[in-house]
């Protein structure tokens, strides 16, 4: 491991020299690639430097303990050695995690599909609650969140389905743990007996595909146009600006109605279709690996109930890792970081174990 870390540090220094060259920015594509590689290695190098400095300090303290004759001084040095011995394995574990291979899709932007499941109107209202939760979390992260498509329910404020686009730094690597079935337990406003109802909403987080990822043949597509609904300008319900694309071989459908023109909606719908096909391709690759990374946390198995939101007890439970929080209002306001951090740690532990097998 230490040889690998030293090699990474040397690579980081080489990249730093290349980026400091005044001519480096002339080729913007190459410059961005080098800069990303440099940024990706920075955290590993900083952790390695801290590990190396701690190890050096420990060695020096041990030497000092051997040569020291003063009893009080020896006691101080021994206390320092004990502290450093405790710190070193923690730093080593951190380095092992940082050296784990990154998932290629983690740096991608995402498409989030939220669909009301069992529970009727309550499920539709909870789909809207989850939508706001993700929009606020994206805002906290400094990401850009955009609504691409929605299908309102009969109850005001609810969604049968809604699709979001989220752009930013390492969005998929952060949001992929949200894929699955989210269950809510609460008393509906229309419930006169005070009984708790259980509803469910499915969430699919898809890494956004690039044009080079998926080959789509024009003859495999069917294009339909229709009038957009909901809020809008003069074109609403007058001009067919909304676009629906069907991929005939798979039956996958994507639609967009939020852009102003039919051309813009067509481009966004094509991007969504590409993303859905890429997700299938990615899932097939993951299936072939069939290792511990296929745990529920990493795959976001959409047939599984991953989380329960219990309103009477103000409790959120993630069933994959037995995580429980009694901060339901804050979580619904987008404060998801504690849950996501816990899921990431569980994922990293599973992947480290897989590396040892």
Swiss-Prot record:
Keyword annotations of the record: Cytoplasm, Methylation, Protein biosynthesis
Coiled coil (UniProt feature): none
Modification N5-methylglutamine, positions: 234
GO molecular function, one term: translation release factor activity, codon specific
Entry keyword annotation includes Protein biosynthesis: yes
Pfam name, any one: RF-1
Any single GO CC term annotated in Swiss-Prot or TrEMBL for this entry: cytoplasm
Protein's UniProt keywords contain Transport: no
Function: Peptide chain release factor 1 directs the termination of translation in response to the peptide chain termination codons UAG and UAA.
Family: Belongs to the prokaryotic/mitochondrial release factor family.
Protein name: Peptide chain release factor 1
Natural source organism: Pelodictyon phaeoclathratiforme (strain DSM 5477 / BU-1)
């Amino acid at each position: 491991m230490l040889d690998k870390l030293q090699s990474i540090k040397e690579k980081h220094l080489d990249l730093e020299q290349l980026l400091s060259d005044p001519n480096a920015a002339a080729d913007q594509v190459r410059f961005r690639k080098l800069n990303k590689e440099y940024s990706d290695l920075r955290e590993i190098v900083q952790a390695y430097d801290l590990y190396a400095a701690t190890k050096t300090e420990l060695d020096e303290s041990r030497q000092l303990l051997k040569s020291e004759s003063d009893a009080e001084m020896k006691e101080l040095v021994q206390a320092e050695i004990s502290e450093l011995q405790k710190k070193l394995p923690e730093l080593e574990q951190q380095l092992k995690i940082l050296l784990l291979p990154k998932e290629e899709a983690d740096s991608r932007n995402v498409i989030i599909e939220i669909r009301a499941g069992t529970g009727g109107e309550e499920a539709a209202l909870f789909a809207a609650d989850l939508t706001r939760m993700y929009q606020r979390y994206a805002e906290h992260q400094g990401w850009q969140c955009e609504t691409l498509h929605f299908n309102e329910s009969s109850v005001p404020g609810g969604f049968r389905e809604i699709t979001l686009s989220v752009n930013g730094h390492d969005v998929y690597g952060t949001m992929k743990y949200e894929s699955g079935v989210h269950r809510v337990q609460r008393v509906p406003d229309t419930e006169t007996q005070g009984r708790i109802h259980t509803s469910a909403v499915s969430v699919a987080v898809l890494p956004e595909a690039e044009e080079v990822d998926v080959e789509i043949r024009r003859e495999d597509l069917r294009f339909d146009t229709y009038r957009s609904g909901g809020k809008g300008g003069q074109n609403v319900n007058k001009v067919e600006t909304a676009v629906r694309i069907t991929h005939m071989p798979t039956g996958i459908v994507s639609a967009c109605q939020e852009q102003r023109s039919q051309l813009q909606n067509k481009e966004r719908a094509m991007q969504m279709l590409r993303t859905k096909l890429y997700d299938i391709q990615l899932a097939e690759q993951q299936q072939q690996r069939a290792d511990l990374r296929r745990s529920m946390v990493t795959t976001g198995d959409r047939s599984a109930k991953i989380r329960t939101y219990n309103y009477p007890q103000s409790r959120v439970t993630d069933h994959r890792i037995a995580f429980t929080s009694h901060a339901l209002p804050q979580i619904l306001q987008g404060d998801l970081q504690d849950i996501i951090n816990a899921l990431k740690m569980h994922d990293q532990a599973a992947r480290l174990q897989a590396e040892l097998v």
